[in-house]
Regions:
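Structural signature of tandem-repeat unit edges
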Residues: 1-6, 16-30, 39-53, 63-75, ...
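Consensus positions within tandem repeat domains that build extended binding/scaffold surfaces
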Residues: 12, 33-35, 55-58, 77-82
Length: 96
């Protein structure tokens, strides 16, 4: 996705704040702190198998986010999913 801002294999933000769905490309290993803070319309996100870390407040306030698969993630930051009131299912792997 062209609107993703990626530096050193870490998503640090996105230039579009009103997106509904998002696919993070393979090779990304981390989602930075506050990367998707208050993306209220984001309801679906596909994470790559290479993702290992989700930063502090990465998805905080993503009120429409319903499901997330974090099977390969080994570190989740503080308040990473705070305020995600529609989040009903999280798939964890053995790394957490």
């Amino acid at each position: 996705m062209d609107s993703l801002i990626i530096k050193d294999n870490t998503v640090i933000g996105c230039s579009e704040t009103d997106i509904l769905s998002l696919k993070i490309p393979e090779g990304v290993t981390a989602i930075g702190d506050n990367a998707f803070l208050d993306f209220k319309k984001l309801s679906e996100i596909q994470l790559p198998s290479t993702l290992k870390k989700i930063g502090d407040r990465a998805f905080e306030g993503c009120e429409s986010l319903k499901l997330i698969n974090i099977e390969n993630v080994s570190m989740i930051g503080v308040r990473a999913f705070a305020g995600c009131k529609s989040l009903s299912k999280i798939h964890f792997g053995d790394n957490i």
